[in-house]
């Protein structure tokens, strides 16, 4: 999974993005209208006029619920809702408020700029939030009872994120500064001097000189403590907790304020930062630091571990810090263990060593006896409770995709979605009983759609192992008829195509156009044990390809409504690589779609930014282990290409650079293979602007 944090980086936090970015990173994106148009031409899917399946317009109309924050009394939840503003060609975020019992819901903000990241004041009177009103990202607040929002911070630079102290009197802010400046005021002076400089040359002496979709400019995100003027602080200044830091806190490109935790007494701040200088591009060493809220006494709590450590979370009594940790340096998809650091002795205890799942969030119960977490789990992303004393794990909500757990009185509130339900908020008792839905933001839209029915299946794949997948019927399914097949290949490669409502790779969008959809969690996927995830290392085109072909054969035999003579395969990121590999190994598909996929693994090493990824996956560098890069390299099988192919790439994709897509298209054209290239000059590894979702070809 390649995104900026461990495997979720390919798919978001190193914990939260350890599926939002982690799953996101190498999961990739796909523009549905363009792709579906190509498939209709190549495969000829019927569209049932009676069945109103999911369309791209429906996806854009869905309101995206996120960022739940429960009030101190546990009775209310503030959350963000993203609407698509087609005229402005962007998403717009507003804040909403609902009672935890689901009886009441109302909109709090309606400003055309983005309002996000709600956080409650300790007395429950105010909801603080980030907003871009006025052209700069600052902290604002609005009364929970309603009214006009008021600006809280008025700093001379954007606030990248914030977290309130437990007493509500101070904040930790993430601000981009020049590390040598030492103070915010001096950093602003440096900005002024840089603005006056003539010329645009950028000079680099080390990697990473660009990351994800941004070129490095010498500034880094630091953590500051800001005190409001009425309590003795300065409106335009703050105390740097990380002076001189030459990496980002929170980490870039996907880290957020979940990487920062404040002790219950407000005396300490735990945070995450990359470790290293010249080796940043080929090390995964990320450590958890502890610093006094006065800026004194910084200590590295995880210096002994040279792999990922992230998601620091103080216990209710402030004596213990829970963190997520990997143990293998250089491997971003290692198992994420829950570790407990005793802050008095600085000793660490691994809580979940015997649990063969990767935890991705951390939430303490009020009594400190349970840690709630979520993890990929056999095609789902489940909610779990972990006993802090014994490490015993209990599944609380198994099916669907669960995330963002919060304490809500005597219940646990969390976000949940499935393949036929966008994210809504739910609560459950701590023992996993009495599941209740809190919000119904998209109920009417969901009811208006004929959803493709789906089921999970398993088969004997590579190495004789059990492999899982999903099959989805077209929205207009008619017994006795056969339907063309959209065969989706997930990215990562350490990711999962599970029971999740995805806004880029959504199988229902294909089912809505008359396709039967098949997607397989091949060797390398997450949620089936670490050995299964590790199996892809050094074997990118081996066991995964075998799983895909065997899984498709199994589905064609089991689901007789799938038409094996009319099939298209589609994938992005690693999935795009696999499309190129499939192209060289079989001609069973009528059409192929390659989005942001590598053609040449050797050159891809020199193109990409996070070198630890190919070095682990292919067993070293191209000069140290050339056979590792040659073993399953699509470029060596171009001579076999003959299937019509659509190639899609973004110009700001620095993970899988655009020349890989251009090279794929060049090879197709030179070979005389019917092909088309869609290039998005301003998009990165994902295509995010709403209007680009509506492109028809």
Where are these regions (language model features)?
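Active-site-proximal cap/loop segments of hydrolase catalytic domains
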Residues: 506, 511-513, 519-695
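Short loop/turn segments that connect beta-strands within beta-propeller blades
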Residues: 99-103, 143-147, 228-232, 292-296, ...
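Residue-level detector of Asp-centered blade-edge/turn motifs that repeat once per structural unit
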Residues: 72-73, 122-123, 166-167, 264-265, ...
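A flexible loop/linker signature enriched in serine peptidases of the S9 family
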Residues: 81-94, 109-116, 130-140, 148, ...
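Non-catalytic accessory segments flanking enzyme active sites
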Residues: 69, 172-175, 196, 200-205, ...
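Hydrophobic beta-strand positions that form the internal "hydrophobic ladder"
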Residues: 74-77, 124-127, 171-172, 269, ...
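Short beta-strand element of the alpha/beta-hydrolase
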Residues: 481-491
């Amino acid at each position: 999974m390649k995104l900026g944090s461990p495997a979720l980086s390919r798919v978001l936090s190193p914990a939260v993005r350890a599926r939002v970015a982690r799953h996101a990173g190498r999961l990739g994106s796909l523009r549905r209208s363009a792709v579906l148009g190509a498939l209709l031409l190549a495969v000829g899917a019927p569209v049932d006029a009676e069945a109103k399946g999911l369309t791209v317009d429906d996806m854009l109309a869905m309101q995206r619920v996120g960022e739940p924050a429960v009030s101190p009394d546990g009775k209310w939840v503030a959350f963000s809702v993203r609407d698509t503003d087609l005229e402005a060609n962007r998403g717009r975020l507003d804040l909403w408020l609902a009672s935890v019992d689901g009886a009441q819901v109302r909109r709090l903000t309606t400003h055309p700029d983005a309002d996000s990241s709600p956080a409650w004041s300790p007395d429950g009177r105010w909801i603080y939030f980030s907003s871009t009103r006025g052209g700069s990202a600052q902290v604002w607040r609005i009364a929970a009872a309603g009214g006009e929002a008021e600006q809280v911070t008025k700093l001379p630079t954007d606030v990248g994120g914030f977290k309130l102290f437990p007493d509500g009197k101070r904040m930790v802010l993430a601000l981009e500064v020049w590390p040598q400046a030492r103070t915010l005021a001096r950093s602003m002076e440096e900005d002024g001097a840089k603005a006056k400089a003539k010329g645009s040359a950028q000079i680099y002496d080390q990697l990473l000189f660009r990351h994800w979709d941004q070129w490095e400019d010498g500034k880094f995100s630091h953590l500051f403590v800001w005190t409001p003027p009425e309590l003795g602080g300065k409106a335009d200044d703050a105390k740097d907790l990380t002076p001189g830091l030459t990496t980002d806190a929170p980490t870039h490109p996907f880290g957020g304020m979940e990487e920062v935790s404040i002790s219950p007494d407000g005396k300490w701040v735990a945070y995450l930062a990359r470790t290293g200088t010249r080796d940043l591009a080929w090390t995964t060493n990320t450590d958890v630091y502890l610093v006094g809220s006065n800026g004194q006494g910084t200590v590295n709590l995880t210096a002994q571990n040279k792999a990922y450590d992230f998601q620091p979370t103080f216990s209710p009594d402030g004596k213990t810090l829970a963190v997520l940790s990997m143990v293998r340096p250089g491997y971003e998809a290692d198992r994420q263990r829950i570790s407990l650091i005793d802050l008095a002795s600085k000793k660490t205890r691994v809580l979940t060593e015997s649990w063969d799942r990767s935890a991705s969030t951390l939430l303490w119960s009020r009594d400190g006896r349970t840690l709630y977490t979520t993890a990929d789990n056999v095609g789902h992303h489940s909610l779990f409770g972990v006993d802090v004393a014994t490490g015993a794990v209990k599944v609380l909500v198994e099916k669907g995709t669960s995330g963002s757990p919060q304490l809500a009185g005597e219940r646990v509130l969390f976000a949940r979605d499935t393949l036929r339900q966008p994210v809504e908020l739910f609560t459950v008792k701590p023992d996993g009983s009495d599941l209740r839905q809190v919000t119904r933001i998209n109920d009417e839209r969901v009811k208006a759609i004929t959803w493709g029915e789906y089921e999970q299946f398993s088969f004997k794949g590579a190495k004789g192992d059990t492999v899982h997948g999903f099959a989805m019927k077209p929205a207009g399914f008619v017994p006795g008829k056969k339907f063309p097949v959209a065969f989706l290949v997930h990215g990562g490669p350490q990711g999962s195509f599970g029971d999740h409502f995805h806004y880029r790779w959504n199988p229902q969008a294909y089912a809505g156009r008359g396709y039967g959809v098949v997607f397989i969690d091949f060797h390398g996927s997450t949620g089936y044990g670490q050995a299964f995830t590790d199996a892809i290392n050094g074997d990118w085109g081996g066991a995964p390809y075998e799983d895909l072909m065997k899984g498709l054969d199994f589905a064609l035999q089991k689901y007789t409504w799938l038409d094996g003579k009319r099939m298209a395969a589609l994938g992005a990121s690693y999935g795009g690589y696999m499309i190129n590999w499939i192209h060289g190994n079989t001609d069973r598909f009528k059409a192929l779609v390659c989005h942001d996929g590598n053609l040449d693994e050797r050159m891809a090493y020199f193109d990409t930014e996070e070198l630890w990824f190919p070095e682990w996956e292919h067993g070293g560098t191209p000069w140290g282990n050339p056979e590792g890069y040659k073993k399953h390299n699509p470029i060596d099988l171009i001579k076999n290409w003959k299937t019509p192919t659509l190639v899609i790439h973004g110009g700001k994709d620095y993970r899988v650079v655009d020349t890989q897509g251009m090279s794929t298209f060049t090879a197709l054209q030179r070979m005389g293979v019917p092909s088309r290239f869609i290039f998005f000059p301003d998009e990165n590894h994902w295509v995010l602007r709403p209007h680009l979702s509506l492109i028809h070809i």
